[in-house]
Amino acid sequence: MTTAFYLLPGARLPQGCAREVLASLTDADRTRLTALGTGREPPGIQRLSEPLHEYSPHRAWLWKVLTHRTGAPVIAPYAWMAEHGPRLDQEFWSIDFWTKDPSGRLARFEFADDALPRAACAAAPVLAESGMRLMISGKSFYTATREGLDYSARPFEDLCGMEETHIAHLPHLADGADKERVNELLHRIEGALREALPAETQDIQGLWLSGGGRSAPVFPPSTFRSVLTNDRTALAWAEDAGIPKAYLGTLGKKTKWPEAPEGDRILVIDDLYDAWMRHDWNAWIKRMPGLLDKLEHWVGQEKPARLTENVIVAWARNLRN
């Protein structure tokens, strides 16, 4: 038997609002949603991610099943390689700058093109003093180190959209023996940037280091035959796990399953994820019809791909929250 695994980040609602949100769906959409569970075994609940990664359990699942590696997902070196950077035998970390959007939520800050060289010149010496090297791809900042850090932090992608009242809790979303060292390093980088680019850094509220680890080819290779997702990092994991590029892709560019060898496949539909992250249940409701349309389309493509069954995995944070 061959299985299609449909991962739906943000599809499980918190218990406190689930009844009300589901009642707000149209009768037709609620019927379509209910039909997904008809004839299936009772759902099982599995905890896959540590508290620092609880907002992206689908990534924790992909990391474990594709790479056969335990622990927190390693993001930064694979994001670097997804941007066509070379594999380096060093520990990679992402350096992100954050600001607040007009609603007060945490948002990514990016330097303008003409400010990037000056920002790099300001940050690089500070990192070098700590035995690290600045790496830039596009507008993304990374740092590489041979020594490694005893440090873990919530992935920056999971912070974006955080409500203003929760931003004060940022210090609690990082851990490890090197936490103070990292905080001091980020403070010095921020100071150097503000000195070199006083006007361009006015909107920066802080810096964040996350996603660290080393990339390594997976052996034995994954038994999954194809992965379709809009997550470039997950696609890099899949490629490192031995799945050929021809059998990988994004949903926007694929309308049918790749002509891969017979075997299990993974497809991630993330239409609800951003709304779920923001607890924007009106947006969640509006996006549900599109998710159901996509899911029905791909289920209809299973037979030509020699898939005999499917598993629907609906992801959530803590179901009690």
Where does each model-flagged region fall?
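N-terminal basic/disordered segments at the start of proteins
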Residues: 1-18
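Short loop/turn segments at strand-loop or loop-helix junctions that form parts
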Residues: 8-10, 95-101, 266-274
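An N-terminal, globular interaction/scaffold subdomain
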Residues: 18-117
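Well-ordered, non-membrane alpha-helical segments in soluble/globular domains
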Residues: 25-26, 113-124, 182-189, 281-295
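A contiguous, mid-domain pocket- or channel-lining segment that forms the substrate-recognition surface
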Residues: 73, 78-186
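Acidic carboxylate-rich catalytic motifs and surrounding loops in phosphoryl-/glycosyl-chemistry enzymes
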Residues: 135-142, 208-210, 302-309
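A contiguous, surface-oriented mixed alpha/beta subdomain in the mid-to-C-terminal portion of proteins
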Residues: 150-281
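C-terminal regions of proteins
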Residues: 257-266, 270-321
